[in-house]
Amino acid sequence: RTAAETAILEELPPVSALILAGYMRIIGPTLLRAFPKKIINLHPALLPSFPGRQGIQDAFDYGVKVTGVTVHFVDAGIDTGEIIAQVPVNITDGMSLVELEQAIHRQEHQIFPATVKNLIQEGAI
């Protein structure tokens, strides 16, 4: 992982933050040191519930009535960084997993760019 992250740093143009969506890898210490509290991730569940790769599936299987989308800073854990923004998504009776995935993705497409824009305007990233 260190070699891969070093290669990423060598290839990146000068940037002030990393914005991740669908990056299904654990961020290691090389990138965390290079971008302290400047790596933003999108997660398809209301953290701290249902961390990891299968957030939508896990929420659906557990039977919760509300799940959602989280934008958070990346830290050394798996989906454990400081939460920046969240939006709920109701799971209605009879909703299929595909319908839930679509509802989650609709919310992701709204909250993620808006949150990143706010962070930039606030000078946080």
Segments the model singles out, each with a brief description of its role:
Residues R1-I125:
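One-carbon transfer enzymes
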